[in-house]
Amino acid sequence: MLFYHGSRSPYPWSLCWLDEFADPTTARKLYNAAFPLVDVTVVPDDEIVQHRRVALLELIQKHIRQRDLMGLIDQLVVLLVTECANDSQITALLNYILLTGDEARFNEFISELTRRMPQHRERIMTIAERIHNDGYIKGEQRILRLLLQNGADPEWIQKITGLSAEQMQALRQPLPERERYSWLKS
């Protein structure tokens, strides 16, 4: 099943994903059958919350382009409490909100979520902190790479950072294309 949550709503094209191929007939032969494309932008929230395990994802995908997700807190709390989302799902949810939503209000969002779910406060804060730390580490690595690329002395960098020879070697490797400009907003 494919989910659409683009900015145009409702989805303006065919809901059969095979029709999106340049040659739909060949696509049908290759993939045997079409699986449905669900336009979550037109599904009512009341219906989405009935979708159990995928409800969290669908609800966030539908509303992520709103710059203020605080209005969804009530529904998210109900889903998180009743569906017993695991750490992996909560991590994916928080990552998605942080990367796609309004980063400026992420901390406020986390604070309100934990205020309403005190029994899960430690778990949510641990996950949010881990996401924050991962971003911090990637930022440090990006700065160190830029220093190296712009002629900074590798021995000096190693001395002040305490990095091992292996870690320094990893910094000299080019970033994968998808990560090179990930900090730029489109």
UniProtKB/Swiss-Prot annotation:
GO terms (BP aspect): DNA recombination
Organism: Escherichia coli (strain K12)
Stated role: This pseudogene is the C-terminal fragment of low activity DNA endonuclease RpnD which probably yields 3'-hydroxyl ends. The intact protein can be seen in this entry (AC B7NGZ6). Expression of the repaired protein increases the frequency of recA-independent recombination, but also decreases viability probably via DNA damage; in a RecA strain expression has no effect on viability but does induce the SOS repair response. May play a role in horizontal gene transfer.
GO MF annotation terms: double-stranded DNA endonuclease activity
InterPro entries: Rpn/YhgA-like_nuclease (IPR051699), RpnA (IPR010106), Transposase_31 (IPR006842)
Name of one Pfam family that matches: Transposase_31
Record-given protein name: Putative inactive recombination-promoting nuclease-like protein YjiQ
Taxonomic path: Bacteria, Pseudomonadati, Pseudomonadota, Gammaproteobacteria, Enterobacterales
Similarity comment: family membership: Belongs to the Rpn/YhgA-like nuclease family.
